[in-house]
Amino acid sequence: SGMYLTVGTGIGGGIISDGRLIHGMEHPETGHILIPRRTGDDIPCTCRFHQSCVEGLASGPMLERRTGMKGKDIPADSPVWDLEAFYIAEALVNYTMCYSVERIVLGGGVMDNKFLFPMIRNYYTELLSGYIDMPQVKDTDTYIVPAGLEGNQGIIGAMNLF
């Protein structure tokens, strides 16, 4: 089982369980799970439906709202990346709790900033607080991984549907 999450203009994803894509009444709205805001973060969320969903707090448009810059132009040492990593990690903890996946793959334009991965993994471990005591979850270097396929995963995935 696994999950792919794209973090870019929006946040979305899919979950595979027993070799099948999870699909119910609608597609999973992985970007619209509600997460607690970090204390002191009072910049209005970019989601018009929620005030604290992961998409509204951590997508590319929110990075631009916070800094006035596109994600690719924000320096790696900007404090906004710490907040970004925290919010993504909050979401990943929730996905782990709900779907119990064996691996989480992160892609999308925001995740092209590879320096985010260690930050996300550290917050993930901190937020999970040892609740799930499984070796594969504890080894965050292999549990939370960057997407491969050089940014073509969406196109290749779509082609595999035909």
Question: Where are the language model's segments positioned?
Answer:
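Glycine-rich phosphate-binding loop of actin/hexokinase-like ATP-binding domains
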Residues: 1-55
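ATP-binding/phosphotransfer module of carbohydrate and carboxylate kinases, centering on a glycine-rich
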Residues: 21, 37-162
